[in-house]
Structure formats: C-alpha cells, structure tokens
C-alpha cells in the first residue's frame, strides 16, 4: 500500500445500479469515485464486446459518467481489503488495487452495487445441449 485517497462517495460496482447511483448523487456536488473490476462499466447486464449493441440507456449512462466533472470512474480496479474508518463518521476504508498500484480509499459514504450473479440450480438433464434453466 503506497498511498491513500479520499472522496465523498465511493461506489463499488459500475453496473446499472452503480452508474445510476453515481448519476443520482452527482448533482449534490460530492466527489464521487466508482470502482469496478471489469475494464468497461456496465456490469453483467450491460456487457461490452464484439457484436454487442448496448441498449440506449447503457450508452447514455456511460456518456454521462465520462462527462461529469465530479465522477471518477476506475475500471480494472478491485477491492482487496477492508479497513476501519479514517475519521469518525466515515465509511470503512477500502483497500483497492489496479494493474499498477494498491491504495487505501477513504470516503464519507459507501454504496455497494456488487451486481448480478448467475444462480445455477441443477436438475435432471440440466447439462444437456440446448437445455437452460
């Protein structure tokens, strides 16, 4: 850990919920940081890639995040640990890392938008080709 940074609001997850939370909070003037381990915002729901056409709302949210002066988006960044608050009344400190460094991220507020996960429920024949459930 070689440094510490501070923001007013830290959002973990840049999927639809994380992007919406940041855009809803942005008019307050807070310094907002969003972290996500994916290389592009959108989460599991709004994935980016070859042959994928993003829904208009996904493109609007991405564009708005990129343009907003008090939103900092850190893609390719993972939460690797949790520490105590930096000051009384603060949220817990998150320990973050990207490809080049690790640091402590202090914030007054923390929103966890850690996203959707597929839930596999095994049933007879569930591994056969063409079967989904």
Give the predicted meaning of each segment:
Residues 2, 7-64:
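Beta1-alpha1 glycine-rich phosphate/pyrophosphate-binding loop at the start
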Residues 2-7, 62-133:
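FAD-binding core/adjacent interface of flavoenzyme oxidoreductases
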């Amino acid at each position: 850990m070689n440094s510490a940074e501070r923001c007013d609001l830290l959002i973990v997850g840049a999927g639809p919920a994380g992007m919406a939370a940041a855009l809803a909070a942005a008019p307050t003037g807070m310094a907002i940081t969003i972290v996500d381990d994916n290389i592009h915002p959108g989460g599991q729901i709004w994935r980016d890639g070859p042959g994928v056409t993003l829904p208009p709302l996904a493109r609007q949210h991405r564009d708005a995040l990129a343009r907003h002066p008090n939103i900092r988006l850190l893609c390719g960044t993972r939460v690797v640990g949790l520490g105590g608050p930096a000051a009384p009344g603060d949220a817990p400190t998150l320990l973050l890392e990207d490809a080049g460094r690790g640091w402590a991220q202090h914030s007054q507020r923390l929103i966890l938008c850690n996203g959707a996960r597929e839930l596999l429920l095994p049933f007879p024949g569930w591994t056969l080709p063409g079967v989904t459930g």
